[in-house]
Structures are given as structure tokens and as C-alpha cells.
């Protein structure tokens, strides 16, 4: 079953593995927002508890209400534990702060641990477009090609509060709009070479 949560799919813009760009060291200094991790198993149990408590009233919730519950659970309970986890192109870790994790595995592991039934390994190894179109209904996918980062950020802001999967030519991650700031959350080789939560407008990868 495909997800009903909005997603933005970015294609044909600067990808994280482009080798022909000269990278300025200053631009690689992405800001990383580190949250204090709590027991990850407890996090997943908390997600399950949220779902159980919401089960009775879930059918009565609006689409927007369901999106907010899902977004809050993922962005504020699951993801903070992963910030700082080391990146590796072949990383397949299932535990935050242990081993390494690649960008695709970061996305699919977070979604799985948030309670979604998905093929974690298969989707993580797909191109980001294939992963997104497998998970998301077409009407919720928006494509951007060769647009200025300011245009993209404005589109996210207009969309409102939410957590979005973003796919580039050779990279994937989450865009999180908390209504005050738009963040790019991803496992990347750029800068600190780990899972980062950075200001999307300042992200070298998105530019």
C-alpha cells in the first residue's frame, strides 16, 4: 500500500556524488543540529503506543491530522537519534550511532521504524525516483528540475508543516518544515560525513 503523505521528488540538480565540481571547504561546513539520543527501542515502542492510542480515533481524523501525527512521530522521536551517525556509501546500520548508514538506508530505516511496512533493503538500493514512486501515490509527488534553491524552499513553505522525502540524482533524504524553518535531514559524505540536520537553504547538496 502506498503512503498518503506528501513528497517532493527532486531530479536533475546537483547530486551528492558529482565528481566534476570543485568543492569549497567553507561550503562543506554544514551546520549539524545534534539532539541527545534516548534509548532507540524505547522510541520505537513510543511510536507503537502513539499508533495504538490513535487507532480508535484515526478514522475520524482529517488527512492533515494524520499527516501531523506521522510527521511529529518521525521528526521528533525517531530522527533525532540518528543525527551524527556515520555515513558510508555501503552503510546498512539498523541502530543509530552504531556502524555506518548510506542515504537510502537512512530513509527506509527511519520509515520502517516509524511503523511503515516496506522492503527496507530493496528500496534503499533503488534509485531515489523508484523508491519514491513505490512508496508514494503520484498525485502527492512534485518534480523540480534545475530550479533555484530559493524557489524550492518557497514551495516547501507554501506546502506547510510536514516531512517530505526528497530524491536527487544520486542522493535522498528528508525535508522537514516545522513552520519556522525548513531543514534537510540526510546521511551524507559532505562535510562531517554523517547524518545531518541542516538549514535546507544553506545546503550545498541541494544547491
Q: For each predicted feature, which ranges?
A:
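Bacterial Sec-dependent N-terminal signal peptides
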Residues: 1-25
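Conserved active-site beta-strand-loop modules that form the wall/rim of enzyme catalytic pockets
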Residues: 6, 116, 162-164
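N-terminal capping segments
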Residues: 22-125, 129
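...with weaker cross-activation on analogous glycine-rich loops/strands in unrelated enzymes
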Residues: 126-196
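Glycine-rich, aromatic-bearing surface loops/beta-hairpins
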Residues: 200-207
Amino acid at each position: 500500500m502506498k503512503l498518503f503523505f506528501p513528497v517532493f521528488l527532486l531530479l536533475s540538480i546537483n547530486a551528492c556524488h558529482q565528481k566534476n565540481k570543485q568543492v569549497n571547504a567553507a561550503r562543506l561546513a554544514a551546520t549539524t543540529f545534534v539532539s541527545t539520543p534516548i534509548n532507540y527501542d524505547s522510541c520505537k515502542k513510543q511510536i507503537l503506543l502513539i499508533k495504538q492510542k490513535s487507532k480508535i480515533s484515526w478514522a475520524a481524523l482529517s488527512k492533515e491530522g494524520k499527516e501531523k501525527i506521522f510527521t511529529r512521530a518521525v521528526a521528533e522521536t525517531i530522527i533525532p537519534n540518528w543525527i551524527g551517525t556515520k555515513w558510508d556509501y555501503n552503510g546498512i546500520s539498523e541502530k543509530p550511532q552504531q556502524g555506518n548508514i548510506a542515504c537510502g538506508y537512512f530513509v527506509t530505516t527511519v520509515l520502517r521504524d516509524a511503523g511503515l511496512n516496506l522492503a527496507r533493503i530493496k528500496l534503499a538500493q533503488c534509485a531515489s525516483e523508484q523508491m519514491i514512486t513505490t512508496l508514494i501515490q503520484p498525485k502527492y509527488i512534485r518534480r523540480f528540475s534545475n530550479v533555484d534553491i530559493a524557489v524550492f524552499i518557497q514551495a516547501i513553505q507554501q506546502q506547510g508543516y510536514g516531512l517530505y522525502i526528497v530524491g536527487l540524482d544520486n542522493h535522498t533524504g528528508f525535508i522537514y518544515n516545522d513552520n519556522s524553518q525548513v531543514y534537510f535531514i540526510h546521511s551524507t559524505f559532505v562535510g562531517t560525513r554523517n547524518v545531518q540536520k541542516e538549514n535546507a537553504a544553506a545546503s550545498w547538496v541541494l544547491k
